[in-house]
Amino acid sequence: MPTINQLIAQPRKAQKARNKVPALNACPQKRGVCTRVYTTTPKKPNSALRKVAKVRLTNGFEVIGYIPGEGHNLQEHSVVMIRGGRVKDLPGVRYHILRGVLDTQGVKNRKQRRSKYGAKRPK
């Protein structure tokens, strides 16, 4: 433990919180191009084939984004919009791809929580 004189000479440094979404550069969303669309398996104890895409952003970052909802139309060279938000059981996936924006279509036959999946209001 430092003495009072040591603290006067060199005060304590405040700890900086690390940025959880560094690729966004303090923007709410970023645009990017899919370089690879594939499925991956989650950590234990979960089991599934989660749909993800590797995206090269306009600022040069290459990130992995999760594709939410059932079914998607993404392929290589699709232009997508990305937001922050990790997927807890997929290590390295710290971003979500927005549905219903740019080349990504909304989820078909979605009745509830439509705005989260870019689905239009059913007639």
Swiss-Prot record:
Keyword tRNA-binding attributed: yes
Disulfide bonds: none
InterPro entries xrefs: NA-bd_OB-fold, Ribosomal_uS12, Ribosomal_uS12_bac
Pfam families linked to this entry: Ribosom_S12_S23
Record-listed 3-methylthioaspartic acid modification sites: 89
SUPFAM superfamilies registered for this protein in UniProt: Nucleic acid-binding proteins (SSF50249)
MF-aspect GO terms: rRNA binding; structural constituent of ribosome; tRNA binding
One term under GO cellular component: small ribosomal subunit
Keyword match rRNA-binding: yes
Keywords: Methylation, Ribonucleoprotein, Ribosomal protein, RNA-binding, rRNA-binding, tRNA-binding
CDD domains named in the record: Ribosomal_S12
A GO BP entry: translation
Role played: With S4 and S5 plays an important role in translational accuracy. Interacts with and stabilizes bases of the 16S rRNA that are involved in tRNA selection in the A site and with the mRNA backbone. Located at the interface of the 30S and 50S subunits, it traverses the body of the 30S subunit contacting proteins on the other side and probably holding the rRNA structure together. The combined cluster of proteins S8, S12 and S17 appears to hold together the shoulder and platform of the 30S subunit.
Quaternary state and interactors: Part of the 30S ribosomal subunit. Contacts proteins S8 and S17. May interact with IF1 in the 30S initiation complex.
Family classification: Belongs to the universal ribosomal protein uS12 family.
Record-given protein name: Small ribosomal subunit protein uS12
Taxonomic lineage of the native organism: Bacteria, Pseudomonadati, Pseudomonadota, Alphaproteobacteria, Hyphomicrobiales
